[in-house]
Structures are given as structure tokens and as C-alpha cells.
Amino acid sequence: MKITIFKITLLLTFLLGLESYSQNIILSERTKISILTCGTGNESYSLFGHTALRIADETTYIDVVYNYGAFDFNTPNFVSKFAKGDLDYFAITHPFNDFMADYTYEHRNVYEQELALPLDLKQKLFDNLNTALSSGESVYRYKFIDKNCTTMVIDIINTTLGEAAISKKTTSELTYRSILYPYFDNHFYEQLGTSIIFGSKVDAISDHIFLPLDLMENLKLSTFRNQKLVQTETKTLLNYAPLVPSSWWNNGYSYLIFLGLIVILNLKIINQIYFFSMGTIGVLFVFLGFYSGHLELANNYNVLLFNPLLILSFCFYGATQRKWLYYLALFSLLLLVIYIVILINKVHFLIVLPMIFTNGYLLVKLALKHNKRISIII
């Protein structure tokens, strides 16, 4: 407890000192303000890259990076707050060399785009950043699409400039889901997991910048006061060949083998566990849709596949002929057909198709078993 209080006190003292210090610093004409775009990595937190702001002034010996992607793992109820959308993210600063050392260690690319701003706006942005750090204005509730390290950098720059100089310039009819999907290539179960946990919001056409690499491309087209906002070529500060991860289990083959064994073995206990797992995941989706502040999780039509009613099939799977289980199976099959109609033009249709087939096969068997008009041994 004493260590925690000491750390908080030290941090507040540092931030207050930083604000006071920055207000006394007058940036020189040699000041450069740039946006750093960090390439993707193979860890879950790095799959989409990262955005940060760099302010460098040789005259005042400043070379600092402002990073809006920090959070505290020691936050009480971390997992529940993250799920609910109540987890606070915040900005921190790094010496530029330390920032680069981290990405050198992770073998991730870093690109730099210098903003063509007059000195007074450079000073204003510098002051705004430090005031936000010390006042707590840099603390924000993370939202996957609407509020993240990229959108926060865009917001503070546009606020400083007094106009939406940085906005989506590239034209595309892609949905948020379609944009995100390729980022999970070579990470099969992450791709599958995000495909089924995201709801209808991510099927909307993307109308704003929310990813680092997207920001980098749009900056090339952005203007301010009838001039290009980035007038120099994008600099590559770090460049590494992409590392393609390999895993004996995190791939589509293990997924197909697993579902194939369920169908081929046709064991009562396995079928029961499958129905229970699918239904439980569906209950989780419904719960998150109401509980979570992450709008991306709301209105999740994937619950038609992960049908909570399947839990009843688990509970009474081995029962003798029950007419209501027959109708339950038919109703679940109807929901599955509706799901296919909704999903058929979505980017994640193929990845969930094996589960659709498995569900359909097991539900047909369940319906036949509990239809008194058909005598069949299963």
C-alpha cells in the first residue's frame, strides 16, 4: 500500500512539474512535430500497430514521445472493467530513444511524418499536450473503434488547429469488420474470436480513421490552410522483414479437425458438451451486449449461431422422445437459416461456416431423435 501511494505521489509530482516546466519552455524555430506510426506485431496488443506524437527541439534539448496507449494492469477489477468499457487509458511520455528501443526490441517498423505547422501552433500543441497530461484530460475510456491511441492523437491535433485538418480522405466502401479482418491473418483463433464477438456496429461503412496505418495513409492527403499537412516524405525509422508466426494449434486445420471429430465420432457426451459450450458463449454475448459500454459488442447477430437455447439441448439430450425438444431443434435450425442469410455477404462467413454445418448436423439429428413420427436409431 505504501509503495502504491508513493508511486502515485511521485507520478503526480512529476506531471505537475512537467506542466510548470513546459509552460516556461519556448520552442525554437527548429522544433519538429511528427506523428509516429508503429507497425503491427504478433502479440494481441500489437496486431493493429500504434500511433504516437513526437516533439523534438535541438535548441531546448527536447525529444519526447507522447503515447496515448497506456493502461494499468493493477487497476482493481481490470478484466470486468475492460469488458464493460470502463477501463481508463491515459497518455504517458517517453524519451524518444527509449521509445525506439522498445520497438527495436520487438522488431517492429516505425514511420515518421513531420507536420508542417507554424511555430505558434507547435507551441500551442506542446502546451496542450503537457496540460492534458498534468490535468488528467489525457485519461479516456478506451473504445475499440471510437477512442484509442490513434483517435486521441487526431483529436488533440485537430483541437489545437481549430479545424478537422486530419480526417478520412481515402474513399472506401469497406466496413469496419472488413478493414479489421486482414489484421488477424496468421492468427486464426484471434480472427475467429473477433469475428464472432463483434456485433452489427462493425458492419457499418468505415467513416473515420481509427487505425494507425490508416492514419499514415490519410496524412499524406490531409491539408491545413490550403497546404499539405505533411510536406516531406514519410521517413522509415525502423524497418524489419515481417515475422510470420507459426503454431501447431493456432490455425484453421486444428479448427476443422476438432469440428470434424465431433461429427464423425457422434458421441452423446461430446455432442452435449458442444451444445453446452455454444449456448454458454451465446449467453455471454447477450450479457456483453447489455452490460458492456463497447458498442462494437452490441446487437450481436452471431447469437443466432451461438444460441443460448442450446443449453436446453445439453440438459435433455439423452432424454426419451420429447416433442418440445423436436420443436426446439426446428426453431434453432430456423435461426441458423436466418443467420446464414444475414452472414452470407459478410467477410467472416467462411470462417464460421464449419460451425454452421456442425450445428445444423447435430440439430437435425436431435430433431429426428425426438420426432415421434419417425422411428430411427441414433
Language-model segments: which ranges?
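Activation targets extended, charge/polar-rich intrinsically disordered C-terminal tails
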Residues: T131-L312, R322-L325, A329, L333-I378
